[in-house]
C-alpha cells in the first residue's frame, strides 16, 4: 500500500493517485467539544510541504466518496484505502467516546451514503495516543447500535503513538478490539529526521508471531528511495510518503518485484500476508 501523506485538500486526491498512491492519509482536526471539523494538519509538518491546506470535513468526505464509488465521474479505481489521522489536541479525554461517535456519524452520512452505495475504500482510524482508546469504542458502538454493524468490515485501527508495543496492545484490548481484528501497527517519524528500523522490525515480528496482535505494519514518512527500499525489505506492508512515484520506482527494481507488488482492491488490508 502506497499511502500518499497529508492529503487534506480535495484536489490532492487526484494529485496523489496520479503519482501512484493506492491509499491516502488525511488529517482530521477535532474541536474541543469532540466534533470533527476540518481536514487540516497545521504547523509543524513534514519538510518541503505546505502545512495549512484544509477542507470542511463533510465536504471532503463527500468528495472522497465520489472518488471511491464505481460509476461516478470522479471515480479513481486505484484508491482502495484511506488513513484518517485523528488530531485530538483540543479534545478532552472525557470526550473521546463522543468524538468517535461523531466521526462515525459523519462517515455514515457523507462517505458511506447512509449505507447505500457509498465509497468502497477501506478506512483506517489512526489514533495518536493510546489513552484516547475510547474514541474507537465510541465509533464502533455507534455503528453497531444504529444498524450499521456491517460497515465495521471496512474499518481498521491503528495507534500511532511512539511507545511500547505492549502498551499499544493494552490500548486495543481496552477499546474492545480483539487481536488480529483489523489492526495496523505504524512506526515512523517526520521526513525531517532520520530513524532506525528497530521498532519497525519489532512491529513486523509481532505481526508475524502466532501470539501477535496486528495484521499489518506501515512506516512513515519515507521519501528517499533507499529508505523506502529498506522499509519494504524489513517487511512493511505500507509506505506512507510524500512522493508515491518514488515507491513505484522502487517496486520496479528487479529484486524487489520478485517479492512485492502494489496492493489491489481484492487484497484484504485486514489480513496478514503469508509468504
Swiss-Prot record:
GO BP term, pick one: killing of cells of another organism
Principal location listed in the UniProt entry: secreted
Lineage of origin: Eukaryota, Metazoa, Ecdysozoa, Arthropoda, Chelicerata
Reaction catalyzed: an N-(acyl)-sphingosylphosphocholine = an N-(acyl)-sphingosyl-1,3-cyclic phosphate + choline; an N-(acyl)-sphingosylphosphoethanolamine = an N-(acyl)-sphingosyl-1,3-cyclic phosphate + ethanolamine; a 1-acyl-sn-glycero-3-phosphocholine = a 1-acyl-sn-glycero-2,3-cyclic phosphate + choline; a 1-acyl-sn-glycero-3-phosphoethanolamine = a 1-acyl-sn-glycero-2,3-cyclic phosphate + ethanolamine
Cofactor note (record): Binds 1 Mg(2+) ion per subunit.
Transmembrane segments: none
Disulfide bonds: 45-51, 47-192
Entry annotation: catalytic residues: 5, 41 (nucleophile)
Cofactor(s) the protein needs: Mg(2+)
Tissues expressing the protein: Expressed by the venom gland.
Protein name per Swiss-Prot or TrEMBL: Dermonecrotic toxin LhSicTox-alphaVI1ii
